[in-house]
Amino acid sequence: LTSTTYVDICSGDISHNYKELFNLTVSLKAKLQKDDKRKETMKLDIVKNRFIFLALSAILLLPGIAAMIYSTITYPTHTPLKVGIDYTGGTTLQYGVKEAISNDKLSDVRQALEKGGIDNPYLQIINVNSQQNTELKSILSIRTKFIEEGSADQDKITNIIDSEFTSPQLVQVSSVGPTLGMELFKNSMIALSLALLGIVAYLTIRFQFDYALAAILGLVHDALFVCGIFSILGLLYDVQIDALFVTALLTVIGFSVHDTIVVFDRVRENLKYYSKKMTFGEIMNASINQTLARSINTSLTTLITLLALYFLGGVTTRDFVLAMILGIAIGTYSSIFFCSTLVDIWEDKKKSDKAAAV
């Protein structure tokens, strides 16, 4: 409120200052409501328990990291995850059968194929919609090393399937050459690298490098968790990754960094108004609590949709959906409890270094 406005008010001449007074009143009221709301939303003390959350992250990641190390040592491909034919090259043969295939029957077929000289076959059951096909009950998908169509190896597989089932039908044969598989793998890694570089550049420009580094570590945290779970599933249930898995990882990275940016943006906004009244830890706590409901609600609505797809969708997209479910769940956790605590630790260290220098 300027001195001129004050004199005009006292003299009764306020007509030309009406708009200014109205704006000041609305601004003051909004600020007071904002302050009250921010005080009310402070519920969780994330900063106080930051080392507990970091320890929890380590507990979540260690089993998966151990599985990836073991897989790298033991797999013929020397990869931390069991890779499918999209990356190694290979052939998929699909046989339609007139009976439902149990897990025990699947195990018997796998043993028969291995005894017949087919190394490391990957078997998958695809249920057939009765409305689409009245004769076939299931489709048995067999992935193996690259074989030529009509070759002796394909005939060998067909003969084994003929001996295990009644009148099976070869419905589809598809192959990916080793060169194309390596090209797909290289392109996938380039896509991941470009995504990470773009995120670092954007966050550094919009915030500062500390925030960008925390966000990238959060993304590494999320990717390690998802890859670790799939490494364990590969060891226990022969789950293989393909191009859809990398697509899921890229989607998870985008979703997770979006959640992290929402928190960091609120921190930046609160620092403008409360940096002299509150410590950085208090501002971080307030910012997390103000965005907590939004983050959880957004993730829950997405997870409900993904769970419906997982249980009701087709088997061919199930691993993709599972990777999305795991990634969004851990991404929500990391944006709230992991990235924010890293920034707070670095801010404390900067403050300590500055005090020591003085």
Where on the chain are the PLM-derived regions?
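A structural signal for conserved, well-ordered secondary-structure elements
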Residues: 1-4, 13, 17-358
